[in-house]
């Protein structure tokens, strides 16, 4: 199953660039790294580039922010020089008892975690997966203020 062509058309018309294992240098100040979605092997994103490969060659003096659907590969991102990983995916378990068991599946299931020099932020998001309901979790939009040092 590939991405919905209507989505592709919308993204193109809106001039949105999807970063599928791609890097953008923003204003020569910091990097945005978009990862392919590991959960969607049928949409053409099965073969993801490993963190050490996608981050190699980047100027590590500049902040590196990784955008990822799932909070995966924290250790690999940290050892490869990423400064921050921003994720969704977990919905913080969405419904009881998932909100209790999700913490067994992910090192950072929801919230903030510092792993070495990597700052990982995972939101429960505003959407749902499967049934359109939440029990025992909250929807959230997480405002983040980043101050670059150095």
Question: Model regions: which residues?
Answer:
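Soluble catalytic domains of enzymes that build or remodel membrane lipids, polysaccharides, and related
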Residues: 1-150
